[in-house]
């Protein structure tokens, strides 16, 4: 049976080789002086439950969950934070005792924290989110709670409609319709897809953006991406990748486990080099 052992904290996903989480948590450990043995584990598909059970039965104290397991991890937990319960998606687990695993979702607070750091967001901002998958699901509740209005653009409209139905009680959220042009340009556009939509004939009209629109890619590649190239064509100079979100969500996971929130900014600068 697949096993992870000899450490207390881990990130589970498939694939996982690209993960920067072990590096980030190593920096947190050195900074805070908290012993924090953290590794990455590639989990075979359909094996998450068995892997997590084995991990927590041994020395496991906390775990991060990445694609494609966040919604599956939600059902593994028997206690949930409010934001995890609303998102129905979990990226952080904490062992409370031998019988209870707490599930949290720090993706949304991670994104919101980075947007505030960048001065990319204000209350009442109009936000367009590209994508209606797990990445979008995890961030909607904090953005709506902050007071922003959200439109979701997704090629499969039904998936966007499902998210709107799930989250409409928490704020102003709608499906973006390219046939009904937005009168006012968006203040912020967030790419929540792993592969940015490249079909120019089936995308967002430039009438919906301005030179003041901010662009945020939840992916954290430092090289130019299609989303980056598209944002530049709008005339905007406000663009960021998702490195800051990655570090902030990791910091909030660390806080859940140790009740200490690490310093953030220098780690973001380090990873962006």
Swiss-Prot record:
GO terms for cellular component: cytosol. Disulfide bonds: none annotated. Gene3D superfamilies: Leucine Dehydrogenase, chain A, domain 1 (3.40.50.10860), NAD(P)-binding Rossmann-like Domain (3.40.50.720). It is an enzyme of class 1 (oxidoreductase). NADP(+) binds at residues 131-135, 218, 242. Keywords: Amino-acid biosynthesis, Aromatic amino acid biosynthesis, NADP, Oxidoreductase. One of its GO terms (biological process) is amino acid biosynthetic process. GO terms for molecular function: NADP binding; shikimate 3-dehydrogenase (NADP+) activity. InterPro entries: Aminoacid_DH-like_N_sf, NAD(P)-bd_dom_sf, SDH_C, Shikimate_DH, Shikimate_DH-bd_N, Shikimate_DH_fam, Shikm_DH/Glu-tRNA_Rdtase. The active site is at residue 70. Pathway: Metabolic intermediate biosynthesis; chorismate biosynthesis; chorismate from D-erythrose 4-phosphate and phosphoenolpyruvate: step 4/7. It catalyses: shikimate + NADP(+) = 3-dehydroshikimate + NADPH + H(+). SUPFAM superfamilies: Aminoacid dehydrogenase-like, N-terminal domain (SSF53223), NAD(P)-binding Rossmann-fold domains (SSF51735). Transmembrane segments: none annotated. Its EC number is 1.1.1.25. Shikimate binds at residues 19-21, 66, 91, 107, 220. Homodimer. Involved in the biosynthesis of the chorismate, which leads to the biosynthesis of aromatic amino acids. Catalyzes the reversible NADPH linked reduction of 3-dehydroshikimate (DHSA) to yield shikimate (SA). NCBIfam families: aroE (TIGR00507), PRK00258.1-2 (NF001310). Belongs to the shikimate dehydrogenase family. HAMAP family: Shikimate_DH_AroE. This is Shikimate dehydrogenase (NADP(+)). It comes from Buchnera aphidicola subsp. Acyrthosiphon pisum (strain APS). The gene is aroE.
């Amino acid at each position: 049976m697949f096993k992870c052992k000899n450490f207390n904290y881990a990130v589970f996903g498939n694939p996982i080789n690209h993960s920067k989480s072990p590096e980030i948590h190593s920096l947190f450990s050195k900074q805070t002086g908290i012993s924090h043995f953290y590794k990455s584990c590639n989990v075979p598909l359909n094996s998450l439950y068995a892997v997590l059970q084995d991990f927590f039965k041994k020395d496991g104290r906390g775990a991060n969950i990445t694609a494609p397991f966040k919604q599956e991890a939600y059902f593994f937990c028997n206690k949930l934070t409010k934001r995890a319960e609303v998102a129905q998606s979990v990226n952080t687990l904490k062992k409370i005792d031998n019988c209870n695993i707490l599930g949290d979702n720090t993706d949304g607070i991670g994104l919101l924290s980075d947007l505030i750091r960048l001065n990319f967001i204000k209350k009442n901002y109009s936000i367009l989110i590209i994508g209606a998958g797990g990445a979008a699901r995890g961030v909607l509740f904090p953005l709506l709670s902050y007071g922003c209005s959200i439109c979701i653009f997704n090629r499969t409209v039904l998936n966007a409609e499902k998210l709107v139905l799930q989250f409409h009680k928490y704020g102003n959220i709608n499906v973006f319709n390219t046939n009904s042009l937005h009168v006012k340009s968006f203040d912020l556009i967030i790419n929540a897809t792993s592969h940015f939509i490249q079909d120019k004939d089936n995308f967002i009209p430039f009438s919906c953006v301005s030179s003041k629109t901010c662009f945020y890619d939840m992916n954290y590649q430092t090289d130019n991406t299609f989303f980056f190239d598209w944002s530049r064509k709008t005339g905007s100079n406000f663009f960021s990748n998702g490195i800051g979100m990655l570090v902030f969500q990791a910091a909030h996971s660390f806080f859940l486990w140790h009740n200490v929130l690490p310093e953030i900014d220098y780690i973001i600068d380090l990873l962006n080099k």
